[in-house]
Curated annotation (Swiss-Prot):
The lineage of its organism: Eukaryota, Metazoa, Ecdysozoa, Arthropoda, Hexapoda. Has exonuclease activity on both single-stranded and duplex templates bearing overhangs, but not blunt ended duplex DNA, and cleaves in a 3'-5' direction. Essential for the formation of DNA replication focal centers. Has an important role in maintaining genome stability. It comes from Drosophila ananassae (Fruit fly). The gene is WRNexo. GO terms for cellular component: nucleus. Mg(2+) 2 binds at D164. This is 3'-5' exonuclease.
Length: 355
């Protein structure tokens, strides 16, 4: 039996214990720090993903589907349906429906303000009348005297005169000196006076614009008078402002509109015509003599269409007053005051019914 026995090398008990210690090595803090250094951020992220995918609550299909959705930042059909239901229950906030000055006319069912109107294609204004253009002081004085004599011959107590001004503008230096005055008392003729060579306005021109029968009108005309006074102190802006008519303000009174008007929008609204407000001409050198054909036509159309707008608003005002008088005769003064207290729009509707 001894021949089948295998002799093992003699070892001490201490040696066996040391062997076991070598096999089972304890991790020291230094060793864990080294392992942490070996793992890059990318490897750590992959480990976290694998740990999340290997949870017992998730099956294989669920793990792959959810992880891919998380990485691609996509929504499942269920999540999309939930979002749609939430949006339908909580719609986005709308703008305030508070009635303002610009929307008051639309709220009353009246004429929309110029800002609310949809743009439409309108025919351009074509002026075929005469254009009388002067650059020298004596010529301007003679022309202004002729116009003043024509005004005095008119039977009307008030003679409307369209008034406008032009001047050069630079983004570096700002507005230049008043260079052009254009007027129109008859739709068949426009007068253009270039002031470049003038140090002082002719007395005949000052007398014309201050004539008691002349009613100057335009859009934002008060600002023109103030600039004219700054450039030519012999003109009194306050005296001209007292008797002038701003067409935009007058339109709001007659047509029950709101907001601020430009001459271009007034032409669209009142005359159903479009104006060619080319920036090339509008920002051109108005102080250079002579003015070219495009500049002359631009200046003439501004006062021509202003005169047309004035005549149209004047006729509308006469019609409105006539309707009010007829309503008073048929229904009495008390009924008229009661209806007017309800608003101008209501009164205009009543006038349409009675007519």
């Amino acid at each position: 039996m001894d021949k089948y026995l295998i002799k093992l090398p003699n070892k001490n008990i201490n040696d066996m214990v040391s062997d076991k210690k070598e096999v089972v090595k304890k991790e020291t803090p230094k060793m864990t720090g080294r392992q942490a250094k070996k793992d890059t951020p990318k490897q750590e992220k992959e480990k976290e993903n694998t740990q999340e995918d290997n949870t017992p609550k998730q099956n294989k299909a669920g793990r792959t589907g959810r992880s891919s959705i998380k990485r691609k930042n996509l929504d499942t059909p269920e999540v999309t349906q939930e979002k749609e239901s939430v949006e339908s229950e909580n719609p986005p906030k709308r703008r305030s429906t508070r009635t303002t000055r610009s929307t008051r006319s639309m709220a009353d069912g009246g004429t929309p303000s110029p800002e609310k109107e949809k743009p439409e294609k309108l025919p351009f204004i074509k002026y075929k009348g005469a254009i009388k253009y002067y650059t020298e002081s004596q010529d301007i004085a003679a022309s202004a005297d002729d116009v003043m004599q024509w005004v005095e011959k008119q039977k009307e107590d008030v003679v409307p005169m369209a008034f406008d001004m032009e001047w050069p503008f630079s983004f570096q230096t700002g507005p230049g000196k008043s260079s052009v005055i254009q007027i129109c008392v008859d739709e068949k003729c426009c007068y253009i006076y270039q002031l470049t060579n003038l140090k002082k306005l002719p007395s005949a021109l000052v007398a014309l614009i201050n004539h008691p029968k002349v009613r100057l009108h335009g859009v934002n005309i008060k600002a023109d008078f103030r600039k004219l006074q700054r450039d030519f102190p012999e003109v009194s802006a306050d005296a001209l402002i007292e008797k002038c008519v701003d067409l935009g303000v007058w339109c709001n009174v007659i047509c029950q509109t709101g907001g601020r008007w430009s001459l271009e929008r007034l032409a669209n609204f009142i005359c159903r015509k479009a104006m060619d407000k080319s920036k090339k001409v509008r920002m051109s050198k108005w102080h250079v003599i002579p003015l070219d054909e495009n500049q002359l036509m631009y200046a003439a159309i501004d006062v021509y269409i202003g005169q047309v707008i004035y005549r149209d608003l004047e006729q509308r005002e006469k019609t409105k007053l006539a309707n009010e008088e007829k309503f008073k005769e048929e229904n009495g003064e008390t009924a008229f005051k009661a209806v007017k207290a309800l608003g101008e729009k209501f009164l205009s509707k009543m006038n349409e019914v009675t007519l």
